[in-house]
Amino acid sequence: MECLRCLPGLLPRAAQPRRALWTAVARLSLAACGGRATPLRSRSPKASSTARAAGDVLRFRTSDASQATLASVAQVFAVTKFDKEGNVTSFERKKTELYHELALQARDLRFQHVMSITTRNNRIIMRMEYLKAVITPECLLILDYRNLNLEHWLFRELPSQLAGEGQLVTYPLPFEFRAIEALLQYWISTLRGRLSVLQPLILETLDALVDPKHSSVDRSKLHVLLQNGKSLSELETDIKIFKESILELLDEEEMLEELCLTKWSDPHVFEKSSTGIDHAEEMELLLENYYRLAEDLSNEARELRVLIDDSQSIIFINLDSHRNVMMRLNLQLTMGTFSLSLFGLMGVAFGMNLESSLEEDHRVFWLVTGIMFMGSGLIWRRLLSFLGRQLEAPVPPVMTSLPKKTLLANRRMDVKNSLRPEGLGASRTILASR
């Protein structure tokens, strides 16, 4: 015990303040766990403030480290910016920095391969499968355009359209109208291009399959038609989603008002345009125009689908006819075999080990053979004629046409009988009885 009492005196002086700090931290933890609080109160306020400062520093360092870790793993967007004059700038931004600059939330920049048009904090967010865009009153941002083959449209066509030099209907309107029309026009042209590629391929394949010169169906053509049918189904789904997304906007008047971004930032835009139409109505007309274009594409795709279904029915009919021919041939051969077997019993009778005087005559062999073949032929012909009568299509009954004058006379008699009053007939019978 005396050695333990002398141990603090043997420790270096530099270790004593550290030991005091450790003791204070241990007592703080005991007080938090429900231990004695009296020794903690008896400690000096200097030790408690030192422990509190150490905890704050540790907490701040942990939060800074977590933020640095999240920033290091954040998604980086390749952004292309288009302003009102058509100037183009490209840069890279992390997802956290980008939604802070645009006053958006993280879920607003979570782009899935779906078609949607939404508004948030005076911003328009457009998702068109692989095309991701954010529209503000001053600029248009295209995100992650790399590896999408969009360079020609982005850097040659889109700047002139946004600057009002292209063939856009909304060039005298605010910037967001031109941006929305340019994106919708690009998507409609993309869908139309896919349809124009599929249409000649499908028609060529159908012509080859339905050609009456070919008695059999080429399986390679059927495989090509199956692949084109799948592509057509995907195109129909994309067109349907595009129509539904635009129809949702047309059904909500508040959404149409929110799409007019400049209306909320510039008070002069509240006035009606030169044509006397409000900007919300012009947005509605714009969306209705592209909805009609999508409807036309849907009708063309539906016509192709109807052609495929009709050709499929024709192919099935041809296959059924070939199958019927094969079944008829099989039935004819079966009848011939039955006829030969029936008259072959005569040969079986002569083939038995029985003696008769007919075996000695050579003419009997040829006579019996001739009778067998003639009888088999006659029976086969009778069976074939019976089969032909059964397979013939029934003749529809002949309707005898009555003369026109007879029909008119009968009709007049019916009209007279229907117009004759019942009371008059009753009175005549009473008078006749009197």
Swiss-Prot record:
Means of activity regulation: May be regulated by calcium ions.
Positions that bind Mg(2+) 1: 234, 237-238, 303
Tissue expression pattern: Ubiquitously expressed.
Record localization: Mitochondrion inner membrane
Keyword Signal: no
Residue span of the annotated presequence: 1-53
Annotated binding of Mg(2+) 2, by residue: 320
Residues involved in Mg(2+) 3 binding: 351, 353
Listed transmembrane segments: 331-350, 362-392
Claim: Zinc-finger is one of the keywords in the record: no
Principal location: mitochondrion
GO cellular component, as recorded: mitochondrial inner membrane; mitochondrion
Keywords, comma-separated and alphabetical: Ion transport, Magnesium, Membrane, Metal-binding, Mitochondrion, Mitochondrion inner membrane, Transit peptide, Transmembrane, Transmembrane helix, Transport
UniProt-recorded Gene Ontology molecular function terms: magnesium ion transmembrane transporter activity
Ranges in the topological domain labelled Mitochondrial intermembrane: 351-361
Mitochondrial matrix domain ranges by topology: 54-330, 393-434
InterPro entries: MRS2-like
Comment on protein domains: The GMN motif acts as an ion selectivity filter.
Summary of the function given for this chain in its UniProt record: Magnesium transporter that mediates the influx of magnesium into the mitochondrial matrix and regulates magnesium metabolism. Also permeable to calcium, sodium and potassium ions. Required for normal expression of the mitochondrial respiratory complex I subunits. May play a role in maintaining the inner mitochondrial membrane potential.
Subunit structure: Homopentamer.
Family from the record: Belongs to the CorA metal ion transporter (MIT) (TC 1.A.35) family.
PANTHER family with a match to the protein in the record: MAGNESIUM TRANSPORTER MRS2 HOMOLOG, MITOCHONDRIAL, RNA SPLICING PROTEIN MRS2, MITOCHONDRIAL
The protein's name in its UniProt record: Magnesium transporter MRS2 homolog, mitochondrial
Organism: Mus musculus (Mouse)
